[in-house]
Regions:
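Sec-dependent signal peptide recognition
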Residues: 2-9
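N-terminal signal peptide c-region/cleavage motif recognized by signal peptidases
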Residues: 15-17
Length: 161
């Protein structure tokens, strides 16, 4: 019993610390508009060498989702979407989901897609990409998600890491 006050203090500090590092649950926009893609447009203009947390993109799948099996981080599903930027330009963006963290997320050609996660500059046929579309795994990142034809993955995330 003599350690009860110390234990209570430690539990209070741990509980408070969780809230300090809590990830935000960002809502899915009601509809896809070029303004939704503003942070993606900023990423493309700045062309950073590092990934950028909390980037959103919306657009239309240009083809069926492709699968990349295996690798050091497991299998991934890659969906290419045509994204209209606020300046009127349309670019291809790859949305990458991790099967271990997101479960398989697939789209058919012409499906509407929203994604929120960590943005990066891509090569080849994509201008950029978004991955980490799952519940947050590091400080500074909101909880990510992908919505394909109205179905959101993950359905929800805990309020703490």
């Amino acid at each position: 019993m003599r350690y009860a006050p110390r234990l209570a203090l430690i539990l209070l500090m741990v509980s408070a610390g969780r809230n300090v590092f809590a990830a935000n649950n960002v809502p899915v926009p009601a509809h896809c508009a070029p303004q939704v893609n503003q942070k993606l447009a900023d990423l493309l203009a700045q062309h950073p060498r590092q990934n950028v947390d909390n980037v959103m993109a919306c657009g239309i799948a240009t083809q069926n989702t492709q699968v990349r099996r295996g690798g050091p981080h497991g299998s991934h599903h890659i969906t290419t979407i045509a994204v209209k930027l606020p300046n009127g330009q349309t670019v291809n963006v790859q949305i990458v989901t991790n099967d271990d963290l997101d479960g398989p997320v697939t789209a058919q050609a012409n499906d509407p897609v929203f994604a929120y996660g960590q943005g990066y500059i891509a090569n080849g046929r994509w201008a950029a990409g978004i991955h980490d579309t799952h519940c947050s795994t590091h400080r500074g990142a909101d909880n990510g998600w992908v919505v394909v034809a109205g179905v959101k993955t993950p359905k929800s995330c805990a309020n703490f890491r």
